[in-house]
Curated annotation (Swiss-Prot):
NCBIfam families xref list: L28
Native source species: Rickettsia canadensis (strain McKiel)
Record flagged with keyword Ribonucleoprotein: yes
Similarity comment: Belongs to the bacterial ribosomal protein bL28 family.
GO molecular function annotation: structural constituent of ribosome
Protein name: Large ribosomal subunit protein bL28
Annotated gene: rpmB
UniProt-listed GO biological process terms: translation
Amino acid sequence: MSRKCDLTGVGVLYGNNVSHSQRKTRRRFEPNLRSVKFKSDITSGAYRLLVNARCISSVEKAGGFDAYILKADDNVLSSAARAIKKKIIQTKTAKSL
């Protein structure tokens, strides 16, 4: 399982631990990932995604899961999130007809 957010694409970063004597040792900065179930109002379904903690508040700020994922760029979304976005768009166009 990759350590990457499904909605924002945030992944592992690499850097250094620096001691008081300025010795540098390599380390990994891992994202604060959480498994969260988002409810879609358009498709009336619930989707479980692996997202970082900051993304949860971004989804709330955007006005909900549907608004956030429709606004998100396809390049940063995971394949599962892209499939959810496609399903939301299809359902939305079917309801508008």
